[in-house]
Amino acid sequence: MKTILVCNSKGGVGKSLIADELAFSFERTGTPISFYDLDSQGGTIHKTKQDPKAQVAVVDTPGALQSQLTDYMKAADVIVIPTRTTSRDIEPLQRMQAAVKANAPKAKVIYVLNGWNRWRASNDFLEWFKGQAGNGEIVKLPQSESFVQASAYGQSVVEYARFGKAVEATRELCNLVRKSCGISEEKAR
């Protein structure tokens, strides 16, 4: 079983949204999953469940660097680190990078620039971060009301909106994670 850890020490960066979208992607293709919501704020649509036949485990973590997080990092095959693209997010992001380097140097790392837009601040952040990401891959999730609306209906943005930049970016992220776990891509319907 492959373990996917969605983590950042900063709250409000989209960890629960991304954990849900990953779980939805695996569910749409019939891939058995376990899901762990470790965040006491309860921001996920999915509830904690353990499937003995699971091929993957998706783990949503709280927004804090806790001692337990290092144990989760050590067990992770893929680490997804969401961040917003503001100057306030730089220091927590750098702390996460250092923690991953120290505790999970062999894990595949995927950075998600959440709330991406075409304005200068997002572009400046991306240009700066390209030099900081090391071997990690970078995916951009756009600012989109579709994420909010889909969540309100308890759905994936892929099922709710079907088309658009939010859907395309979510598919790209999910397929990159799937590939990193050795699971075939989800095809667009």
Regions found by a protein language model. Give the residues of each.
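Short beta-strand-centered segment that lines the nucleotide-binding/catalytic pocket of NTP-utilizing
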Residues: 29-44
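Walker A (P-loop) phosphate-binding motif
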Residues: 1-31
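Inter-lobe coupling/hinge region of RecA-like P-loop helicase motors
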Residues: 148-174
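Conserved C-terminal guanine-recognition region of P-loop GTPase G domains, centered on the G4
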Residues: 91-118
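Switch II (G3) loop of P-loop NTPases
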Residues: 36-40, 52-69
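Beta-strand-loop-alpha "switch" segments that mediate conformational coupling across diverse proteins
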Residues: 117, 127-158
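Structural beta-sheet core signal
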Residues: 34-35, 81, 111-113
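Inter-motif core of Ras-like GTPase G domains
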Residues: 66-87
